[in-house]
């Protein structure tokens, strides 16, 4: 199991990144909440990781903190929750927000996540309640501290990256395009476009 990687951020292509560790490039998929906290390309980066081995692929998921990684592991233990749905949940809501939903048994925020209907949300909250008794909603301690932002990407590229990232989370292409097109400030980075689009959808 690969539990942590430390190296240099070589590339960002939401929701994936390439982490260069001593010349070896690891492709890592991250939730949007981690993506927002990434440093600039070329800067050092440490990720807490979870490796999924399948017959046809080995998939590496990365998180800004051990707490996020552990939360992801709790989610994928649930019946019917795979890595894709777990990342969609963690991309739409911060860990503390998800914990509060569990504590309050509040389905409203969860049902806005792609792939989560009311019945699924209710089942997830019931299953999570006992597991998360030890999870208090406390201020998150993230390992990543944003450095100076990268130079703004070309508008068309940033919009395209944002749309692709939303589609990867399970949103329909039309929904993703509409959410990104609704953003008035076209000079934003792809990360900021994704953040605003998700806020508009949740």
UniProtKB/Swiss-Prot annotation:
Gene name in the database record: ruvA
Region annotated Domain I, chain positions: 1-64
CDD domains: UBA_RuvA_C
Organism: Pseudomonas fluorescens (strain ATCC BAA-477 / NRRL B-23932 / Pf-5)
InterPro entries from the UniProt entry: DNA_helicase_Holl-junc_RuvA_I, Hlx-hairpin-Hlx_DNA-bd_motif, NA-bd_OB-fold, RuvA, RuvA_2-like, RuvA_C, RuvA_C_sf
UniProt name for this protein: Holliday junction branch migration complex subunit RuvA
Xref: SUPFAM superfamilies: DNA helicase RuvA subunit, C-terminal domain (SSF46929), Nucleic acid-binding proteins (SSF50249), RuvA domain 2-like (SSF47781)
Family of this protein: Belongs to the RuvA family.
Source domain of life: Bacteria
Region (Domain II): 65-143
Subcellular location: Cytoplasm
Region Flexible linker, residue ranges: 144-154
Quaternary structure note: Homotetramer. Forms an RuvA(8)-RuvB(12)-Holliday junction (HJ) complex. HJ DNA is sandwiched between 2 RuvA tetramers; dsDNA enters through RuvA and exits via RuvB. An RuvB hexamer assembles on each DNA strand where it exits the tetramer. Each RuvB hexamer is contacted by two RuvA subunits (via domain III) on 2 adjacent RuvB subunits; this complex drives branch migration. In the full resolvosome a probable DNA-RuvA(4)-RuvB(12)-RuvC(2) complex forms which resolves the HJ.
Chief location: cytoplasm
Region (Domain III): 154-202
Pfam families: HHH_5, RuvA_C, RuvA_N
Record GO biological process: DNA recombination; DNA repair
GO cellular component term, pick one: Holliday junction helicase complex
A Gene Ontology molecular function term of the record: ATP binding
Xref: Gene3D superfamilies: 5' to 3' exonuclease, C-terminal subdomain, DNA helicase RuvA subunit, C-terminal domain, Nucleic acid-binding proteins
Keywords: Cytoplasm, DNA damage, DNA recombination, DNA repair, DNA-binding
Record's function text: The RuvA-RuvB-RuvC complex processes Holliday junction (HJ) DNA during genetic recombination and DNA repair, while the RuvA-RuvB complex plays an important role in the rescue of blocked DNA replication forks via replication fork reversal (RFR). RuvA specifically binds to HJ cruciform DNA, conferring on it an open structure. The RuvB hexamer acts as an ATP-dependent pump, pulling dsDNA into and through the RuvAB complex. HJ branch migration allows RuvC to scan DNA until it finds its consensus sequence, where it cleaves and resolves the cruciform DNA.
Spans through the membrane: none
Domain characteristics, as noted in the entry: Has three domains with a flexible linker between the domains II and III and assumes an 'L' shape. Domain III is highly mobile and contacts RuvB.
């Amino acid at each position: 199991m690969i539990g942590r990687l430390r190296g240099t951020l070589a590339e960002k292509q939401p929701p994936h990144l390439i982490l260069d560790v001593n010349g070896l490039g690891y492709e890592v998929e991250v939730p949007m909440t981690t993506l927002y906290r990434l440093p600039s390309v070329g800067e050092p980066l440490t990720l807490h990781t979870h490796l999924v081995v399948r017959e046809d692929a080995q998939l590496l998921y990365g998180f800004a903190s051990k707490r996020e990684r552990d939360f992801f592991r709790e989610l994928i233990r649930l019946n019917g929750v795979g890595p894709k749905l777990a990342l969609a949940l963690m991309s739409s809501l911060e860990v503390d927000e998800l914990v509060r939903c569990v504590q309050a048994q509040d389905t409203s925020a969860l049902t806005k996540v792609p792939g989560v209907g009311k019945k699924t949300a209710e089942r997830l909250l019931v299953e999570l309640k006992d597991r998360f008794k030890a999870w208090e909603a406390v201020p998150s301690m993230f390992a990543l501290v944003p450095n100076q932002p990268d130079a703004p990407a070309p508008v068309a590229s940033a919009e395209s990256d944002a749309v692709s990232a939303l589609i990867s989370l399970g949103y329909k292409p039309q929904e993703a395009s509409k959410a990104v097109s609704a953003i008035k400030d076209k000079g934003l980075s792809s990360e900021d476009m994704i953040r605003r689009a998700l806020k508009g959808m949740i």
